[in-house]
Amino acid sequence: MRRIITILLLALTIGEAWACTAVIVSGKVTADGRPFIFKNRDASDGTNNSLLTLHGTKYQYVGVVNYSTSSSPTSIWYGHNEAGFAILNTLSYYFNSPTSKANTGAGALMKKALGQCATVDEFEALLQQTQAQTTPVTLSTNFAVMDSLGNVAFFETCNTSYTKFDANDETVAPNGYLVRTNYSFTSPYYDVTNHVGEQRYKAACKYMEDTFGDGKIDAQQVVHELPRYLYHGKREVNLWDDIPDDINDVTNTYFSNFIPRYTSASASMMQGVLEGENPINTVSWIAIGWPCGSFTVPIVITPSRVLPSVVKRATDTHKSEMCTNALQLKNNVFTIYHDGTQSTDSIDLSKLINLEETGILQKVMAADAQVGELGMTLINQLRAGAANETEVAAYYNWVDDYWREFFNQAISPITTITTDKEDDEAYYSIDGIRYPSRPTTPGIYVNNHHKVLIK
């Protein structure tokens, strides 16, 4: 059965080049008492993300960077350091003026903060110093910060001022958590910004309310589910409500302004520590690459700076293997038009989810649960002093092998068939080149997730 689902969102859509979704949560309302900050990162000009470990003026830290050939990129887009300080941001549109969304200084400031800040107070002091400079840094952003003392807050920030929102303050965050997307409530242009990202704001709020209600918030559940949440906050459409029969039940579906989107580049939940716990036990759970097509891996800081090979920036390509692979999986989900071009706002839903549970998201979720379970065992051992860098390296090696096995199975066609028939409504691909109809050149092509031998 071939179906087309059209979700009428175009009239509601505003171009969001840097459209991120963030949640901060007080340790008062989490299942284990540890605070955390979460970000689903979108970046139209930086979708190939990777991890680096660097050393700032005071502290070693791990952070996510865009593709770059520099050994020390100028910007970090989220991360945590050995003192237990963590930071992320979302772009806040039109904070300084009703026509400008410039935010060129946020990445550099986050890099500086990771290298020298241990607490939220120290970050606030750095922010004050930055805004007091003769030539202010261009900022139009919502920073989220957390420290080993249990402090966790948003800073809605423009060029010359900021407002702090403390998640531990019940008058500010009655439910113990706060959500931000791409606007700021304190912006003088709040009423004329069209509240960019409001769809995702409403979706994130609904997820938190529906999933946890008055109960304790599970950090691992949030990072496992929220970056893959298929609910549209404004249209109140859940793509799980009418899913295709199987992977060949082509269902072209408009896919824009969900939390996961074409430009989603990575996701992270940075979890803090309990009172008195060693700050080195702060952990970043990171899905590098399109989150619907990648694993969430716990990242800790070690003396030798060990990282999984598949998530760190490679010395030759300057990209991460998992991110590159996840982008390939993403390309198999988004609609290919008959002229061979790819849509950025339409997916074949059957390739993402279906009743036979062979969609890429369903495969990812199942594998991600295993990665998370083993990762949580390791983190608990580290917290108890029952594991060290050797165990961390062994787990990372397992992640490398498991990811490569998973990807090869996910990207490889299910069966091999020989055909002389032409399917003019499907695309064929080989070595990354896509054809809108049956090619004439012999070879083994991917067609509808099957391997097709054309003679």
Predicted regions and their residues:
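Residue-level detector of functionally pivotal "anchor" positions at catalytic/ligand-binding pockets or at interdomain
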Residues: 411-433
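Positively charged n-region of N-terminal signal peptides that target proteins for export
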Residues: 1-4, 455
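C-terminal, well-structured catalytic/ligand-binding subdomain of enzymes
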Residues: 21-73, 89-111, 147-410
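Sec-dependent N-terminal signal peptides
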Residues: 4-13
